[in-house]
Amino acid sequence: MNYSRNRAIVFAIVHSNMPLNKASIKFGLSTRQIRRIISKYKKEGAESLLPVSRASKTHANAIQEDIIQRIIILREQLTTGGWDAGAKTIHTYLLKELEPSKVPSISTIWRILQRSGKIIPEPKKRPKTSYIRFQADYPNETWQSDFTHWTISNSEDIEITTWIDDNSRYILNVKAYKTTTVHTIIETFLDSAYKNGLPTSILTDNGLVYTTRLSGGKKRNNQPNSFEQLLDNLGIKAKHGRPAHPTTQGKIERYHQTLKRWLKAQPVAKTIEELNLLLQDFQTLYNQTRPHQSLNNITPTRSLH
């Protein structure tokens, strides 16, 4: 079963209302085959689209007990560490540990986790196929930036600023500040550029630390801020998401979810200095160790280089 093709079929028919006969021609399948894919998707959700290993043709109850236990342990270790712990991620880790012929399929791993009570099926959950994704074609084509809030042990609100490469998902810079300012953005941008070269463009929201283009009401005659002037001097194109459309910066929004899940699994930082040490550890693990599903399960470091 071709997972990417089946995702495209579901997106085309369920979410874009493509006629069945047109889908049959486009994807090279009979209408009966397409109906079967859609029917299974509606009954079982996105997991029904996962590939089934042709090598083993085995079910979850036919897998060796030691492999089942390793799957459960990996799930617990990844969850405790604050990392993604789905069937795809576990499958990637198993491929590093075992001979490929001994690794269960993603769908079998999912069923093992379900049977052990580690996950609950969500057939009505919106599938990832329903999101239209954009990705830069090469590293340093586009960088994304945003900041998010985090609380340290004394209840002080801290802001974490990040720059990521859109193509490779590589974290270029992540640092905590008491307040994110235009100076903060310039400092982190230049530090990223010093280590990785300059990007062709950047993509951010419309926060005033990034742009003044929407400030000043209807007149909008505001002068560009110092960060915008820097970009202009360097010949770097600034792109910004539409107001009330946060999905434009979807990659960095999902990154924030990963970051916060990981931070919650760590000892609570007492100071901003301790938080920045944690962020350095996170950056290393995220870039060099964690497989990224959107990168065909390689790390951002491998994708960048």
Per-range role (PLM):
Residues 2-18, 68, 72-80:
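Short, amphipathic alpha-helical "recognition" segments used to contact nucleic acids or chromatin
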Residues 9, 34-37, 45, 71, ...:
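Mobile genetic element proteins and their domesticated derivatives, centered on retroelements
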Residues 21-27, 90:
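Short alpha-helical "recognition helix" segments of helix-turn-helix
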Residues 36-40, 108-116, 282:
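Residues in the recognition helix of alpha-helical DNA-binding motifs
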Residues 48-142, 222-228, 299-305:
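Basic, flexible linker segments flanking DNA-binding modules
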Residues 107, 111-170, 178-200, 229-233:
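Mobile-element integrase/transposase regions
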Residues 194-219, 242-244, 299-301:
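Acidic/histidine-rich, metal-coordinating catalytic segments
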Residues 220, 227-296, 300-305:
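Charged alpha-helix within mobile-element recombinases
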